[in-house]
Amino acid sequence: MGSVKSAGLSLLLLSFLLYVADSYPNTDLSNMGCEACTLRKNTVFSRDRPIYQCMGCCFSRAYPTPLKAMKTMTIPKNITSEATCCVAKHVYETEVAGIRVRNHTDCHCSTCYYHKI
């Protein structure tokens, strides 16, 4: 009788663990907290009319620099990185409370630039 109880308890514990493992979210956690590059309403400047700007994450990676490429560098670096940023395809300037701002109309991932507001 004791072995039946222990087998039943083991089976119950196993089924509970399988339930927990199955209910765990099956998502890619590498970019957790950073949504894709999209057009979003800027709440700071959207007072009398909506102002949209590009926000979100794009591609980035780092890898060891190939030896052939390292030989051509004036200051050799062991790690090479490449990245794209969330930038506007089309913009037009508008004025909000006496400040000129860029209202974005379309976004994509492209070469990273430092943008002015």
Swiss-Prot record:
Its main location: secreted. One of its GO terms (molecular function) is follicle-stimulating hormone activity. Keywords: Disulfide bond, Glycoprotein, Hormone, Secreted, Signal. The keyword Glycoprotein applies. GO terms for biological process: G protein-coupled receptor signaling pathway; positive regulation of steroid biosynthetic process; regulation of signaling receptor activity; thyroid hormone generation. Disulfide bonds join C34-C57, C37-C86, C54-C107, C58-C109, C85-C112. It is found in: Secreted. Residues 1-23 form the signal peptide. Pfam families: Hormone_6. GO terms for cellular component: extracellular space; follicle-stimulating hormone complex. Glycans are attached at N78, N103. InterPro entries: Cystine-knot_cytokine (IPR029034), Glyco_hormone (IPR000476). The keyword Disulfide bond applies. PANTHER family: GLYCOPROTEIN HORMONE ALPHA CHAIN, GLYCOPROTEIN HORMONES ALPHA CHAIN. Heterodimer. Glycoprotein hormones are heterodimers composed of a common alpha chain described here and a unique beta chain which confers their biological specificity to the different hormones. Shared alpha chain of heterodimeric glycoprotein hormones. These hormones bind specific receptors on target cells that in turn activate downstream signaling pathways. Involved in gametogenesis and steroidogenesis. Belongs to the glycoprotein hormones subunit alpha family. This is Glycoprotein hormones alpha chain. It comes from Acanthopagrus latus (Yellowfin seabream). The lineage of its organism: Eukaryota, Metazoa, Chordata, Craniata, Vertebrata.
